[in-house]
Structures are given as C-alpha cells and as structure tokens.
C-alpha cells in the first residue's frame, strides 16, 4: 500500500499577511487619491514587495490545500508584480478592469463558503478595481473627469 503524504506549512494563516500588505497598498492608493502624495511613483515602488509577499502567501495557501485562497491571492500576486509596468493609458485601464473581473469571479466562487464576510469583501474589492480602472486615464484629476 502506498502511503499518502500531505505537506502543510505550520504558520499562522498566510492569508492575514497577504491581506495586510494588500491593505497597505490600498492605503497608499487612497492617500494618492486624497492628495497626500503627489507622485504615483510611490505605488510603483511598493508594488513589487507587496507582490512578493502575496506570492509567498499564495504558495503557503496552496501547500495548505486552500484552493480558494490560492485562487484569490495568485492573480493578485501577478497583478502587483507587474503593476510598475502597467502604462497609464487604455491598456492600464483594461488591466485594472480585468483584475476586477477576476475578483468578481472569486466572489462567485466564495459564495459556497459558510462565511459570508468574504464574498462581501471580494465584491467591494472588485468594484474598487473596476472603478479605479475607469478612473485610470493617465493621471487625470477630478476636475478633468
């Protein structure tokens, strides 16, 4: 008989680390939108470390057989890793709308979970990505919209 072996990484929930760094990035986006920062380069400089930490969380959730966490954090890790290379034009807008659609798909997938807070948070994140994508037209100000 063959023995079955499962590898589990014994750490305190990698999801929390991923959510923390995503929230940190979101605070910087909010600060840029509110005029606290005047250069969007701060987002590009912090996006790669955020992407690396979310990728680590994705690998840990995969090893812990958390398919939903892998489906949520995997595309976000790729998005944050390529964020500095997203142009400020219609292609950048489509990238943000695309990740918003991926979050909407994750929202539908998470409806099978017994916890109802996750679909709500994912839906809000999807709407935020889509609205940011529609606003992302080369750094326009509110007066030009």
What are the residue ranges of the model-derived segments?
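Membrane-helix interface "capping/anchor" motifs
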Residues: 60-70, 108-120
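N-terminal topogenic module of multi-pass integral membrane proteins
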Residues: 1-61
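Alpha-helical membrane segments in multi-pass integral membrane proteins
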Residues: 94-105, 116-145
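Structural signature of hydrophobic alpha-helical transmembrane segments
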Residues: 38-51, 88-100, 120-121
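Extended, compositionally biased regions that are outside compact catalytic cores
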Residues: 9-12, 35-41, 85-92, 113, ...
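Membrane helical hairpin/interfacial module
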Residues: 52-87
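Hydrophobic alpha-helical cores of multi-pass transmembrane domains in eukaryotic membrane proteins
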Residues: 24, 51-52, 78, 100-101, ...
């Amino acid at each position: 008989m063959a023995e079955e072996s499962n590898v589990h990484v014994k750490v305190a929930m990698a999801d929390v680390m991923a959510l923390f760094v995503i929230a940190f990035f979101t605070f910087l986006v909010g600060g840029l939108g509110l005029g606290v920062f005047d250069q969007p380069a701060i987002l590009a400089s912090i996006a790669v470390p955020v992407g690396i930490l979310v990728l680590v969380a994705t690998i840990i959730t995969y090893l812990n057989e958390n398919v939903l966490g892998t489906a949520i954090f995997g595309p976000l890790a790729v998005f944050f890793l390529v964020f500095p290379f997203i142009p400020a034009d219609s292609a950048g807008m489509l990238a943000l709308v695309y990740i918003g659609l991926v979050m909407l798909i994750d929202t539908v997938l998470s409806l099978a979970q017994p916890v109802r807070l996750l679909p709500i948070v994912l839906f809000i994140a999807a709407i935020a990505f889509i609205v940011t994508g529609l606003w992302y037209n080369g750094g326009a100000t509110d007066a030009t919209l």
